[in-house]
């Protein structure tokens, strides 16, 4: 399977026919700029390209009234003055003789994409469309939107395929109130929207855009609004919202399909959003969503009005859907005060409805939290006033670190025969090794732990590590004997440092003691998941128990491991599963899959050989980009699991700001 790109050049036909400063930014060049970007990067040719077809009137009727559909159809025969008069009856809308055709194509593209994904023709995809849709309501155009493309896609998925749980993620900078109204009382659709709000002073100026609008009737708790009350929100703020609000709810909801209202006016440089999130942030957000719903993601373009920023952001999303590694994130991973206040308001509003939030831990913030303005000065060299100047934005976009994908995605060096591991296709069996003399030199400090066969294995593992650091292999799995696991991990740490890795994240599970000579200089972040008690040796070395509940395990990953990993910004991740590691198949796969994002996939997983037959296939699939299996029914974290996380967060959040999930008391 692959990635679909649904498009039709006719969607560039509708355009503004009169002077209107509010509407002029929704122009045909938005589509052509995005498509040109995909072509220049060679991404279009890697997709399954589908030519959009018009949605039928019956399909439009899944959301819209017959009278409204007829009214839009009538615009095909109106002259300019009549179109202008009709447009003025709506808020921030213009009609054109080709609007009906274009809007039907946009809706049809969304439906085609759902069909392609749910029939298994592709794994995921993007519908590149205009006009956008998320503001459109049952009987009203609104905010450049004519038909509600994503709402239609959700209704179509429910009606045609019988889906019972659909997640809609709306990261457009405007509130998609049209989607909210349509599914306000529907518990089968979980709608998450973040949006510029500024305490109700930003368009569409609605009280129901605030955090306390949670849905009605049976739909209470299934509308999740995260209002941004300042401009300048950046990468760290968006990540914090995903890690501390969206993903906990999404895992508990367990969707069968993820729809993304992919508006890129929330990206840097956009005159509407005035936000600071750089294009590569959308690659990370996309990859974080790929662990849900079996990876079935249908993204539909919404807003985005700075052409260069829009094109770059679309490319970032598509290359992630295609399976390319995520590029590094720019900037400090420090959420601002206003973002944390918004996150706390959402958690407060949603806690009655979600077990995952009832177990949430919220340490008090330190006074060193940066404001958006302070971070803007560091990122752009000027404050985020109106439109960002080209001479500030273009150099920033040029900084995007687009590493080519390594020729080998996943490699394995194992003491167990390959046939016994049932590895997925495309995984390379590593036969190469570093020189014996070099291996012996690295193993000298642990001579008692390495037998002759262990040295041969270590040589292969060092060869894997070199391949990852040289950009020839994206990630790898290796096996060792139980006796040699800790020593192997220590050797790998030292070799990473010798090869001038700036930061190495070590996630060690089971009976693996921290190396005695492990430096505390900020180059190694050591997290040991073992035992019954949490402990802190320093701000870079600590341990925590392995939770036994699904809720506790998800809180460990989303509330501790990923915030630490993103805050540390490692060059390399070493994931070691030692004796008595305690991980089940699905847990190991999810941990590996989630750790790919912060490090661009550069992971070396070392597994003691007693566990490799059980874990090899699921680990390899996760590292290879396949969606990890479900953890099973959601179960609430125990008080002991919550206490362990609380202990660590309260002591670490002063250094690791992404652990913060709440604003200080008034």
Curated annotation (Swiss-Prot):
Tissue expression notes: widely expressed.
Pfam family, one: Hist_deacetyl
Gene3D superfamilies, sorted: Histone deacetylase domain
Reaction catalysis annotation: N(8)-acetylspermidine + H2O = spermidine + acetate; N-acetylputrescine + H2O = putrescine + acetate; N-acetylcadaverine + H2O = cadaverine + acetate; N(6)-acetyl-L-lysyl-[protein] + H2O = L-lysyl-[protein] + acetate
Compartmental location: Cytoplasm; Nucleus
Region spans: Histone deacetylase: 1-323
One Gene Ontology molecular-function label: acetylputrescine deacetylase activity
Enzyme class: hydrolase
A GO BP entry: homologous recombination
Main subcellular location of this protein, as a coarse class: cytoplasm
Active-site residues annotated for this sequence: 135
EC code(s) of this entry: 3.5.1.48, 3.5.1.62
UniProtKB keywords: Autophagy, Cytoplasm, DNA damage, DNA recombination, DNA repair, Hydrolase, Metal-binding, Nucleus, Phosphoprotein, Zinc
Gene Ontology CC: cytosol; histone deacetylase complex
Complex formation: Interacts with HDAC3. Interacts with HDAC2 and NCOR2/SMRT. Interacts with HSPA8/HSC70. Interacts with MSH2.
Protein name in the entry: Polyamine deacetylase HDAC10
Taxonomic lineage from the root: Eukaryota, Metazoa, Chordata, Craniata, Vertebrata
